[in-house]
């Protein structure tokens, strides 16, 4: 069994449980869409392989065993654009569960650190943003990271700069309070209630 096969063998049951549609057929039947667990599994595999959407689909056409474990045939694979659009529709709650599942693969301490980072939008997508009147230029990502394993425990994404980092840190800390003994942060997170 290859590493990819072991990986997909772990991902598919988790994706089925998280999306709640494990009983559905992965491939679209009678004009329907792909099952959510199949699309989530394909995205996890794309990230694991560190490839583009197009390359992931091309590789999977040559891997019938892997596509079979997802419940698809090579002929049933979605187009790269379908896979890309499906990624935008995955809810944050599904992403958080997948993040938590991946963090459990590490030996976690009870100590974490929190910090925020801003990401600029890619210049390649500027034309698309102007065409649809999408004005987001920066994305603020706040991450909670285990200090021993460097595993990301939680993430919060925001497109606006309103509110303080301390308010957001309090929300993330409450969500993970049962798992933490200490939380480290820089002085931008200085708040009495935190």
Question: Where are the regions that the model predicts?
Answer:
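Alpha-helix initiation and N-capping motif
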Residues: 1, 5, 12, 53, ...
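Major-groove recognition helix of helix-turn-helix-like DNA-binding domains
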Residues: 69-90
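Basic, short loop/linker segments at the boundary and entry of helix-turn-helix/winged-helix-like folds
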Residues: 1-48
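Polybasic low-complexity intrinsically disordered regions
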Residues: 31-37, 48, 54, 58, ...
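Short, surface-exposed helix-loop/turn micro-motifs enriched in polar/charged residues
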Residues: 52, 71-75, 186
């Amino acid at each position: 069994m290859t590493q990819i096969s072991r990986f997909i063998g772990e991902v598919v049951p988790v994706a089925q449980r998280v999306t709640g549609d494990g009983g559905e057929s992965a491939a679209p039947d009678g004009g329907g869409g792909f099952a959510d667990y199949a699309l989530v599994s394909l995205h996890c595999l794309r990230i694991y392989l560190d490839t583009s959407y197009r390359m992931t689909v091309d590789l999977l056409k040559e891997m019938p065993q892997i596509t079979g474990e997802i419940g698809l045939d090579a002929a049933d694979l979605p187009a790269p654009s379908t896979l890309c659009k499906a990624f935008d529709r995955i809810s944050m709650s599904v992403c958080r569960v997948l993040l938590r599942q991946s963090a459990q693969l590490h030996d976690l301490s009870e100590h974490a650190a929190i910090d925020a980072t801003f990401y600029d939008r890619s210049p390649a997508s500027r034309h698309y943003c102007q065409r649809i009147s999408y004005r987001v230029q920066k994305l603020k990502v706040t991450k909670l990271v285990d200090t021993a394993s460097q595993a990301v425990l939680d993430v919060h994404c925001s497109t606006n700069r309103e509110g303080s980092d301390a308010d957001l840190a309090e929300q993330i800390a409450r969500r993970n309070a049962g798992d933490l003994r200490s939380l480290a942060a820089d002085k931008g997170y200085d708040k009495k209630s935190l």
